[in-house]
Every structure is written in structure tokens, then in C-alpha cells.
Amino acid sequence: SQLVEKKNLTYQNFKEKENGMNKASVMNWNYDSVKHFSPYPVLTEKQIKSFDLVICCADNLDVRRLLYRSNIPWLDLRAQGRNCAYISYRADRNKHDVLLAGPEGSFSCQGDSWDGSTEGQHFSHIIAAGMGAEWIHRYFAKDDVADFKVVNV
């Protein structure tokens, strides 16, 4: 969903007062490093076919399906508890149904038991971002890039 939902509060770094608000807008207000944003709901492949690369950080199974079945280069970043991964358009298409499995396509960043404090917080979402940044750099430098990578911390 594009809106903060109650289920997001425990694992996507949102606060109770942000429940029901647009996720992109909340990110813009909360992070000084976000200089410009423009919510862009993706509903069809036609909307993204001109992009050089699509980076997916969605918790929406329909968006992932659209991307995985497209002919557009993409990178999907995921984090769940102490695990993180990236999956690229180069991954074996026969395995996409397995890669798309999960409850409503959601993959937690801090784990279901995260209470909002930083004590014992899992930082797998930061690891996923770092791995993704390296992959993107290599992709645009025309270096070899991996199909996927999974890390357990």
C-alpha cells in the first residue's frame, strides 16, 4: 500500500501518528536527505518501460509481479529480520514464483517483534541498501552483476 498501515509500524520505521498517511510524504518530512520526491504509483509496465533500471523496495506483491514479468531491467531489495537479499532481472525466471512467495508480499525490515526502540534493532535494511548501491554502481559501470544475493546476519 502507498499509505502507512498499522502493520507497517512495527517494521518500516513509521510512527503511530503517521498511520494512514502517504509513505513517500512521510519519508520526505522525516528525512532531510530526501531533497525531492514525487509519488509515482506504478500500475502498468508501460509506465516504466522507458526507465534504464527500476529499483523495487515495495512491500506489494502485485508491484513485484508486474516488475518480475516485465522485460525491464530491475533490482528488488528485501529485508526481513536478520536476513536481507537482492534479486535482479537476471535471476532465473523459472524461480520467480518462489521469489514472489510471502505473506502479501511483505518482508519486514526489523522483525515482527520490533518495539520501536533502537535496542536490539536489526539493521538488515541498511545491509540491503548497501548491497543494492554496489549492484547499481556495477550495473551502470557495465561490470558483472549477480542474479541475486542473500545475507543472514
Located regions from the model:
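Adenine nucleotide-associated cytosolic modules
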Residues: S1-V153
